[in-house]
UniProtKB/Swiss-Prot annotation:
Gene3D superfamilies: 1.10.520.10, Peroxidase, domain 2 (1.10.420.10)
Species annotation: Shewanella baltica (strain OS185)
Its biological purpose: Bifunctional enzyme with both catalase and broad-spectrum peroxidase activity.
CDD domains named among the record's database cross-references: catalase_peroxidase_1 (cd00649), catalase_peroxidase_2 (cd08200)
Similarity comment text for this entry: Belongs to the peroxidase family. Peroxidase/catalase subfamily.
Lineage of source species: Bacteria, Pseudomonadati, Pseudomonadota, Gammaproteobacteria, Alteromonadales
Residues flagged as site, Transition state stabilizer: R86
A Gene Ontology biological process term: cellular response to hydrogen peroxide
Subunit composition and interactions: Homodimer or homotetramer.
Free-text cofactor note: Binds 1 heme b (iron(II)-protoporphyrin IX) group per dimer.
UniProt-recorded name of the protein: Catalase-peroxidase
Amino acid sequence: MSENKCPMHHSAGGTTNRDWWPKQLRLDILHQHSSLSNPMGDDFNYAEAFKSLDLAAVKQDLLALMTDSQDWWPADFGHYGPLFIRMAWHSAGTYRTGDGRGGAGSGNQRFAPLNSWPDNVSLDKARRLIWPIKQKYGNKISWADLIILTGNVALESMGFKTLGFAGGRVDIWEPEADIYWGAEDKWLDDKRYSGERDLEDPLAAVQMGLIYVNPEGPNGDPDPFAAAVDIRETFARMAMNDEETVALIAGGHTFGKTHGAGDAALVGPEPEAASIEQQGLGWKSSYKSGKGGDAISSGLEVTWTSTPTQWSNNFFENLFGYEWELTKSPAGAHQWIPKNGAGKGVIPDAHDASKRHVPAMLTTDLALIFDPDYEKISRRFFEHPDEFADVFAKAWYKLTHRDMGPCTRYLGPEVPAEAFLWQDPIPAVDHPLVDEQDVTDLKLKIIGSGLTISEVVATAWASASTYRGSDMRGGANGARIRLAPQKDWPVNQPEQLAKVLKVLESIQSEFNKSGKKISLADLIVLAGCVGIDQAARNAGVEVTIPFTPGRMDATQAQTDVESFAVLEPVADGFRNYHPTQFSVSAEELLVDRAQLLTLTAPEMTVLIGGLRVLDTNADQSKTGVLTARPEFLTNDFFVNLLDMGTTWKPTSKAEDRFEGVDRVSGQPKWTASRVDLIFGSNSQLRALAEVYASSDAQLRFIDDFIAAWTKVMNLDRFDLRRA
């Protein structure tokens, strides 16, 4: 056999479908993180495993590691704390409010692209340093939890009192395919901006491969005023206000240093591109020893304080204590030092006790005193160190726990007793739950209320479908659909919503007078279930819709209007709601929303078919309602969509609305959106639609619709499941 002929006959490295058809709809994002990639098995319960963990012992091991400097990657100042703070920060700091994706909740820093981002240089070493501890405690602590816990212990080991720590983050085992990190194909490019400096949604970082902002200033321009603009935008997009922003920057930069000892061109490829013998490590430097005092990461060479391994107010003391002038690091990066040679000898060297340095600052540090609003906060923190410490503790806790969902998911002995508004609190259940007879009585009340099937189903869907599996916000629990801002969202049809809620509140009030109680949150879901039950009965099928009470009603005071505003759908294919034309197609937005709802392609398909025949469009239009008998739970949507007697033609310039006409007579039959027609156009979705359009599929369709509906109604019922 010729040496040049590969004996393996497989598809690896070949041309993919997406190479041929780049605009092909991606459905793979609906089928991530299954048991096929997870070595733990379906029966593994991480919450139970974590409960058996001796957290104090783990912390003791981490504490010992802080000063156990390893020759293969020596600790700056003899302490790994600053490196571990950066590791935790950069794990949590990818979170963005726009779609709730990113963050520390899945341990995704272990995988591409994050493990190889330019901003994460040397964090591969940080994770290797804590591997012996992960190895020791095994599956009792996830990588995701360990990374954040290590950052907490790092702070505590350097004299800072943290607010607490919650476990419960479940590891993923493959890179996330659903997260849009930007359209750029080069590191540190910034095609994400348009206009004056409008950052593309939902992105929260200024350049590809950065966590937040460029520390040298926008695109490397050392302008502190312009840097402040970027800082405010990016931190706001990950849920931080000005006070929290200043505290996080100053608190983080109280410790450690940056690394720019030499020419960055001497640093080798990132982990994903490194040679196999480096075993997953990257950025191998050929500058001198490549480590310790010779390390190169960001290219900046900055130590902020005279006590870089101890909590202090020295960051602000130095920031306000000197006038600053621009200089360059040995690697050629823009940074700042005191004017007129001030500050000589006040900063220790990280590896040589005989050397001393001047303080240095980043352009983004100076933004904290150049920007008037940031300056007021910085000066207050400078003059009131205790207040600074308190705000930093709360902001750090928020940073590292923001994507974990409600505090009912938090695990461990260090969970703070205090509930915070950003956790979207919901009152605990304070009454016995309704029993089977109560549910039967309430169903009869709903049936006799005069509300239509489409009204109650649409309201329940609107309530539950706000859920995002990315950060576990939203959902039916809390009944926030009756509160600002959700009650006023156009997609929720405010007039119809107010009508439905008024009727349901009347039923609730009457029932609660009996001495028993049901929350409006439960009643909204129950009403939707009643609607589906009636629709199935209309179609001649008797069904039982699962309903599990236990939801409670949040108050307006427990609901941050600005925070919840980001949950408003810009489009919702499930309700044929597309008020604005985007560069992204309506079908892509549908798949994105389905992914946030943790739906599979079959679940998405059957829900679309069911919601259409139940007549739940947001604008009450008949677009996509491909049935002559609305409010009958039938497979008519699929039957009529795949009917070869119908031809379709666009009726709008944007080709987002279509008319279906009789192939022979030319008479109009239906109207549809791109979301509707994709189930006949896309080969994978058409295959699913064919299953439900078959003559023997009616019962399967109803069963599958009810299962998918129940899943969505219970997505935020963390009390019913533990990962």
